[in-house]
């Protein structure tokens, strides 16, 4: 939801020295929680789902230029489990949704978005990956008060680029992100249309299935509450259940030294610096100038 952001954010002024260092590696004590156990009959459904995808690919081959990226995506050991969980075991729905995403990825090519293409969207820090929650989920901050561009396809590509980098940062055993949306400084003049917000919500829910672990919506004024009320019918129940609004203390879920000190319980005195942030993230994720990675995608 990067395009929810606007200029002129006034953040809490915390005393003491600040740091531009970005936390891109989970602390030793952060451990992924146990994965949901399979239910009776799920193994057979998973095999059928995988075969359905293979049969589809045999009839609709991937373009050669994108084939290696599709193979990496399909090789994720829990890919099929995520789709089955997202549909609560509905095999027919799982088949439809995974093929929808396969075709979307062939068209959008999220793994190979060049950094320079989306760098202008990153200059004000409206999306920041920094820190990990107690279960080693990467934390993605979305700050509407730092919007610096007009609504465009590039904004959506930057949202997807940020999600892909969050996935790259996940340690083994972790499949989800924690998202913190900070509406501090947001005003009505820069709010997106409901249609635009729905489009992004569709991408997140449809093509990044079961990637949201937790979400916190902070510093939310009343007019944003009305916006969420209008958007709510377009959010699936699973997504809505993971969102917490104006949480008074986030340290139940995120260690204070991993949480930006702009938020309840946070103690990490982070100061955004575009050059430092961009260089650190691109290098940590192994992103090359053409958008490809030096290491296999997580």
For each predicted feature, which ranges?
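Basic, amphipathic alpha-helical/coil surface patches used to engage anionic, phosphate-bearing ligands
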Residues: 1-298
